[in-house]
From Swiss-Prot:
Belongs to the neurotoxin 19 (CSTX) family. 04 (U1-Lctx) subfamily. It holds the Pfam family Toxin_35. GO terms for molecular function: toxin activity. Residues 21-41 form a propeptide. It comes from Lycosa singoriensis (Wolf spider). GO terms for cellular component: extracellular region. This is U1-lycotoxin-Ls1i.
Length: 107
């Protein structure tokens, strides 16, 4: 039963990884076409660093590309601003946990 769960988790991880690659490629193509006249793309943004001004510029992690995650922050003046950082979405964290667990079991 455990082997079946590990195999299913690996399949879900592979499908998620391949779909994430396809979506990232589409987003990158759209972004590049919009930025054709602007300066060349800057280096990617590391995990936990701010991506408010470049939401598609996050680096790749071990298995997946980090996603720019945003939240609304209210300052002491009562002004609302959006702050974003590159991070790993929960479903990607779960997939990485399953793969790590599988590596420990199967060596």
């Amino acid at each position: 039963m455990m082997k079946v769960l590990v195999v299913v988790a690996l399949l879900v991880t592979l499908i998620s990884y391949s779909s994430s690659e396809g979506i990232d490629d589409l987003e990158a193509d759209e972004l590049l076409s919009l930025m054709a006249n602007e300066q060349t793309r800057k280096e990617c943004i590391s995990k936990h660093h701010e991506c408010t001004s470049n939401k598609h510029g996050c680096c790749r992690g071990n298995f997946f590309k980090y996603k720019c995650q945003c939240t609304t922050v209210v300052t002491q003046d009562g002004e609302q601003t959006e702050r974003c950082f590159c991070g790993t979405p929960p479903h990607h964290k779960a997939a990485e946990l399953v793969v790590g667990f599988g590596k420990k079991i199967f060596g």
